[in-house]
Amino acid sequence: MTLQYQTIADCVGNTPLVRLQRMAGNTSNTLLLKLEGNNPAGSVKDRPALSMITRAELRGQIHPGDTLIEATSGNTGIALAMAAAIKGYRMILIMPDNSSAERKAAMTAYGAELISVSKDDGMEGARDLAERMQAEGRGKVLDQFANGDNPEAHYTSTGPEIWRQTGGT
């Protein structure tokens, strides 16, 4: 059997670029929309999540079977849960307890373990706990907020893809 895609990771990217046909007001501007919701985990965060894990692997910082830890409140956590599952990592996601049930369900569907912090502690509390857990040797924090591999995904993937789809115009 020949498959077009070997893993879900192969489905990340190459999302459609469409021209908005109608806009409110009198404008002659062209507006193009990149449909990143077509990525497997459903958002623009799929690319950075896969990038952060893949590039950390290439640097020898993490290996399949390791535990990854991340503070999140949404789409990055869902995408990291997916990417970790694909690549064989245990994923612990730390989030404020007022995060939506739907996001939590998506994360656990990919096998992530969730830890809640109080809504009063918020994302800062989630980040602090992630750092403490890493200091205790309980896993490796990817740190989406300061990790250069996060935006790099768009320089190496999204940008060239848009250039190709528009013919450079």
UniProtKB/Swiss-Prot annotation:
Pathway: Amino-acid biosynthesis; L-cysteine biosynthesis; L-cysteine from L-serine: step 2/2
Region (Disordered): 146-169
GO molecular function terms attached to this record: cysteine synthase activity
EC numbers for this chain: 2.5.1.47
Residues found modified as N6-(pyridoxal phosphate)lysine: 45
BP GO annotations: cysteine biosynthetic process from serine
InterPro entries assigned: Cys_Synth/Cystath_Beta-Synth, P-phosphate_BS, TrpB-like_PALP, TrpB-like_PALP_sf
Top enzyme category: transferase
Reactions this protein catalyses: O-acetyl-L-serine + hydrogen sulfide = L-cysteine + acetate
Pfam families referenced in this protein's UniProt entry, alphabetically: PALP (PF00291)
Named cofactor requirement(s): pyridoxal 5'-phosphate
Protease in keyword set: no
Keywords: Amino-acid biosynthesis, Cysteine biosynthesis, Pyridoxal phosphate, Transferase
Binding residues annotated for pyridoxal 5'-phosphate, in chain numbering: 75
Family the UniProt entry places it in: Belongs to the cysteine synthase/cystathionine beta-synthase family.
PANTHER family for this protein: CYSTATHIONINE BETA-SYNTHASE
Name of the protein in question: Cysteine synthase B
